[in-house]
Amino acid sequence: MLGVVPLAPAIDIADETYVGCPPAALAPVVAEPATWARWWPDLRLSVTRDRGIKGQQWAVRGALTGSMEIWLEPIGPGTVVHWFLRADPPGAARPARSGGLDKERQRRVKAWKAHAFALKDRLEGAERVT
């Protein structure tokens, strides 16, 4: 029996940022709901999987509907922070390519990188690894 193949989400982002400190320094920040509200004020997140030192997975509601994850991967003395956002604007038509969706993707990536680099600067200043 053939099934229906679901469409890929309109917003599908994967990003990586190296932070020169161990996952144990990052995990409490990632797990803090106040951090989420600062980073994504237009999204309502609910934890679907608390991975502890490995990160968090969330269901996303609000300006977008879907899922998001931060995975903390230990690499040498530091951590690669993987950020995944797979979501759609609620109730929106989903053209294959849309200037509005492209701008939304770019806006989300740019905002995330600003948060990731601010976190990197703050934590590496406190726990710099060489």
Residue ranges of each PLM-predicted region?
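Hydrophobic/aromatic beta-strand elements that line small-molecule binding cavities or substrate pockets
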Residues: 16-17, 46-49, 67-74, 84-87
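Short beta-strand segments that buttress and anchor functional surface loops
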Residues: 55-63
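Signature tryptophan residues that serve as conserved aromatic anchors
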Residues: 36-40, 58, 83
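Hydrophobic ligand-binding cavity/cleft-lining segments
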Residues: 1-46
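Coil-to-beta-strand transition motifs
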Residues: 63-65, 74-80, 99
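A short, structured loop/turn motif at beta-sheet edges
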Residues: 20-24, 50-53, 72-80, 126
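Intrinsic-disorder/low-complexity, polar/charged segments enriched in Ser/Thr/Lys/Arg/Asp/Glu/Gln
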Residues: 10-16, 55, 67, 80-82
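A conserved amphipathic terminal alpha-helix motif
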Residues: 88-130
